[in-house]
Amino acid sequence: MVSLIEKNQLDSFIEKNPSWIIDNKTIKKEFKFENFIEAFGFMSKVALLSEKIDHHPDWQNIYNKVKINLTTHDKGGITTNDIKLAEAIDKLINS
């Protein structure tokens, strides 16, 4: 069973991944690509990752930008699932 992440765990994640921002009960990040096709391709890869992890982002796409917000709605905040997905997204973008 997944539970809310402890503050020290969240602080550690942000320290290692400063491009993710804490916003209330969410972690968020904006990605910028050369064009819409690259942005949409990235979203497709994240969608497949999300299915594999069984945790899905709230996101927005405007042309070459993708904004991702991660939270666990049924827990009312940030959980290990959000951190796991954020790390997987960063690994994907850096590969």
Curated annotation (Swiss-Prot):
Catalysed reaction equations from the record: (4aS,6R)-4a-hydroxy-L-erythro-5,6,7,8-tetrahydrobiopterin = (6R)-L-erythro-6,7-dihydrobiopterin + H2O
Gene Ontology terms: biological process: tetrahydrobiopterin biosynthetic process
GO MF, any single term: 4-alpha-hydroxytetrahydrobiopterin dehydratase activity
Top enzyme class: lyase
Domain of life: Bacteria
Classification via InterPro entries: PCD_sf, Pterin_deHydtase
Pfam families listed in its UniProt record: Pterin_4a (PF01329)
UniProt EC number: 4.2.1.96
Keywords, alphabetical: Lyase
Annotated family: Belongs to the pterin-4-alpha-carbinolamine dehydratase family.
PANTHER family found in the cross-reference section: PTERIN-4-ALPHA-CARBINOLAMINE DEHYDRATASE
UniProt cross-references to HAMAP family, sorted A to Z: Pterin_4_alpha
Protein's name according to its UniProt entry: Putative pterin-4-alpha-carbinolamine dehydratase
Lineage, opening ranks: Bacteria, Bacillati, Cyanobacteriota, Cyanophyceae, Synechococcales
